[in-house]
């Protein structure tokens, strides 16, 4: 269906256009945005969910909600920190889906590329338009052909949120090798999950409603270095560190599930 969005334009979007895993993130960001004291705000996500006009509450259970809010805050803050050090960096949101990180962290000088598979970018263009410093681009995380269209830069910052957790170990290796081969130096912000989650996709409170399953899980980001020795692990933070700030359940999960929850790992090469 079509409904007006910002600027009076219309969003021509159907429920089937959106991958199930993307619905999880969209539903959570939309519902959080609608709260009076929202910790994150994503008006575009709310517009998308409102346009679809369907019940997506099953994709918004408590723990997944808190996890997505936490990772959104953690990615945003880490990106701002890196951009403050490299204000002219080229930033690439690889596997961007409907994510709108550019508006959260833009400093007025970065160049930003939202990259995803062609079918996903085609749907994204129903929602977003290219801007002077924020461009959408077809690209595969397992094939670096697209990287030749990325301009030269003194620093590259690659964001992969909710992507690598669905890859096999071989696919993770292919992706890491591709990044290091394609860009002479850079940072990678990656979402990692545990071996426990790899084995229990169908027990996940939101993913169980999709056909998706988690791929290779790790106990530490150091395991990535075995696949790509050119990379160094700069930092690794469990989402529990953010989630425990907001609720008793979050604080309890930080204790009983400290080795289960996902992490934000930062790599450099």
Regions found by a protein language model. Give the residues of each.
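Short alpha-helix
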Residues: 212-238
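Core SAM-dependent methyltransferase catalytic element
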Residues: 247-269
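Conserved beta-strand signature within the Rossmann-like core of class I S-adenosyl-L-methionine
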Residues: 182-195
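Rossmann-like AdoMet
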Residues: 2-92, 96-139, 152
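A short, conserved alpha-helix within the catalytic core of class I
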Residues: 166-178
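A conserved beta-strand element that flanks and buttresses the S-adenosyl-L-methionine
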Residues: 158-159
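Short, glycine-/aromatic-enriched active-site segment of Class I SAM-dependent methyltransferases
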Residues: 195-212
């Amino acid at each position: 269906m079509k409904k007006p969005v910002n600027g009076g334009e219309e969003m021509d979007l159907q429920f089937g256009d959106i991958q199930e895993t993307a619905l999880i993130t969209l539903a959570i960001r939309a519902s959080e945005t609608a709260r009076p004291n929202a910790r994150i705000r994503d008006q575009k996500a709310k517009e998308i969910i409102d346009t679809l006009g369907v019940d997506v509450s099953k994709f918004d259970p408590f723990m997944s909600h808190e996890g997505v809010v936490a990772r959104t805050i953690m990615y945003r803050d880490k990106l701002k920190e890196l951009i403050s050090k490299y204000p002219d960096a080229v930033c690439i949101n690889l596997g961007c889906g409907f994510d709108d990180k550019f508006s959260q962290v833009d400093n007025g000088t970065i160049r930003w590329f939202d990259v995803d598979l062609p079918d996903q970018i085609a749907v994204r263009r129903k929602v977003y338009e290219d801007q002077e410093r924020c461009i959408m681009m077809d690209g595969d995380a397992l094939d670096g052909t697209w990287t030749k269209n990325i301009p030269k830069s003194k620093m590259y910052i690659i964001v992969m949120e909710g992507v690598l957790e669905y890859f096999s170990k071989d696919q993770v290796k292919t992706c890491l090798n591709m990044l290091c081969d394609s860009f002479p130096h850079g940072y990678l912000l990656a979402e990692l999950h545990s071996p426990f989650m790899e084995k229990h996709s169908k027990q996940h409170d939101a993913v169980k409603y999709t056909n998706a399953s988690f791929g290779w899980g790790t106990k530490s980001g150091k395991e990535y270095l075995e696949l790509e020795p050119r990379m160094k692990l700069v930092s690794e933070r469990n989402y529990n560190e953010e989630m425990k700030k907001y609720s008793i359940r979050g604080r309890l999960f930080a204790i009983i599930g400290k080795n289960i929850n996902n992490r934000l790992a930062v790599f450099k090469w």
